[in-house]
Swiss-Prot record:
GO terms for biological process: positive regulation of translational elongation; positive regulation of translational termination. Residues 1-23 are annotated as: Disordered. The gene is EIF-5A2. This is Eukaryotic translation initiation factor 5A-2. Translation factor that promotes translation elongation and termination, particularly upon ribosome stalling at specific amino acid sequence contexts. Binds between the exit (E) and peptidyl (P) site of the ribosome and promotes rescue of stalled ribosome: specifically required for efficient translation of polyproline-containing peptides as well as other motifs that stall the ribosome. Acts as a ribosome quality control (RQC) cofactor by joining the RQC complex to facilitate peptidyl transfer during CAT tailing step. It comes from the Eukaryota. The keyword Protein biosynthesis applies. Pfam families: eIF-5a (PF01287), IF5A-like_N (PF21485). Lys-52 undergoes hypusination, a unique post-translational modification that consists in the addition of a butylamino group from spermidine to lysine side chain, leading to the formation of the unusual amino acid hypusine. eIF-5As are the only known proteins to undergo this modification, which is essential for their function. There are at least two genes for eIF-5A in tobacco: 5A1 may regulate the light-dependent translation of specific transcripts while 5A2 may be a housekeeping protein.
């Protein structure tokens, strides 16, 4: 045994899976699903009856939670689909750099500096204008499958 104290930075997720399996027939509208390797929010589900050859099928129409692109997939209802672990975390906005990155304050007092401003023009304008006016802003960051993006903004009053 050594008397040294080891400090570990918790950057990784300990090898935890980015997705979990769920039977296609149990995935509902407003749920999440992985289509073509992208985490998506389901906007429409339709099920076809069992045919002469095989299973009932689920037709998913979903929107990529990061790019907003519409994706579709057809899966037998008895088969498993990958469902992404989707997390939303709120951070206080501290600073916006010239190169488009934001500096965020985490709950434990550390800063998170590896996120870009969102690509959504409306949200981008709200963040820049609110920050320029000196408001205290809290941004919601959505993370799934190793990607993170600012998805919402809350104004918690003047500084």
């Amino acid at each position: 045994m050594s008397d040294e104290e080891h400090q570990f930075e918790s950057k990784a997720d300990a090898g935890a899976s980015k997705t979990y399996p769920q039977q296609a027939g149990t995935i509902r509208k407003n749920g999440h699903i992985v289509i073509k390797g992208r985490p998506c929010k389901v906007v429409e589900v339709s099920t076809s009856k069992t045919g002469k050859h095989g299973h009932a099928k689920c037709h998913f129409v979903a929107i990529d939670i990061f790019t907003g692109k519409k994706l579709e997939d057809i899966v037998p209802s008895s088969h498993n689909c990958d469902v992404p672990h989707v997390n939303r975390t709120d951070y206080q906005l501290i600073d916006i750099s010239e190169d488009g990155f934001v500096s965020l304050l985490t709950e434990n007092g550390n800063t998170k500096d590896d996120l870009r401003l969102p690509t959504d023009d409306n949200l981008l304008t709200q963040i820049k204008d609110g920050f320029a006016e000196g408001k205290d802003l809290v941004v919601s960051v959505m993370s799934a499958m190793g990607e993170e993006q600012i998805c919402a903004l809350k104004d918690i009053g003047p500084k």
